[in-house]
């Protein structure tokens, strides 16, 4: 999964989970990520690192204009509905390397696909080994 973002100017993203209003995010955008995507763009905007075994999605605001807006973790079975508004911004939606402009007021849904894919991972390397090695997780840099 990817993100909704602006090219210039501020956008507002009305966000509903299972038809319940969560919040209207005002800022540069909103990232909806899976556990696999949690260590990418979502992490860089302050989202949590999520273990791949967790059945969840993460909603991470990008440069929110309200300091109380924080990432939220929701069940992976959730139906996320987003409605995007912008006064003076060009709005795009991006998933992986594909970017598509969307019109003001566009509404769309995000949910897990019914199909799954399997990632080949060596049995002798755990998720936590990878965190420590690639992200220097818990490494003491004081020396």
PLM segments and residue spans:
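Short, small-residue-biased leader/transition segments that mark boundaries at the very start
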Residues: 1-5
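Gly/Ser/Thr-rich active-site loops/lids in small-molecule metabolic enzymes
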Residues: 24-27, 32-68
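ATP/nucleoside-binding phosphotransfer catalytic cores, i.e., glycine-rich phosphate-binding loops
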Residues: 17-21, 70-143
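Generic signature of intrinsically disordered, low-complexity segments enriched in small/polar residues
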Residues: 8, 28, 44, 120, ...
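Short, hydrophobic/aliphatic alpha-helical segments
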Residues: 14-33, 83
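A generic structural signal for short beta-strands and their flanking turns/coil linkers
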Residues: 9-13, 28-30, 39, 53-58, ...
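Generic, low-specificity signal for short hydrophobic/alpha-helical stretches with a mild N-terminal bias
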Residues: 12, 31-32, 41, 62-64, ...
């Amino acid at each position: 999964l990817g993100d909704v973002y602006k090219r210039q100017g501020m956008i507002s993203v009305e966000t509903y989970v299972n038809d319940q209003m969560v919040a209207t995010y005002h800022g540069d955008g909103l990232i909806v990520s899976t556990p696999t995507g949690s260590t990418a763009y979502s992490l860089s905007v302050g989202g949590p690192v999520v273990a791949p075994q967790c059945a969840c999605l993460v909603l991470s605001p990008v440069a929110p204009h309200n300091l109380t807006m924080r990432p939220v973790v929701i069940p992976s079975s959730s139906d996320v509905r987003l409605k995007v508004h912008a006064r003076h911004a060009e709005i795009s939606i991006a998933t992986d390397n594909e970017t598509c402009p969307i019109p003001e007021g566009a509404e769309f849904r995000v949910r897990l696909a019914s199909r799954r894919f399997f990632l080949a991972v060596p049995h002798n390397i755990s998720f936590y080994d990878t965190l420590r090695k690639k992200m220097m997780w818990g490494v003491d840099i004081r020396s």
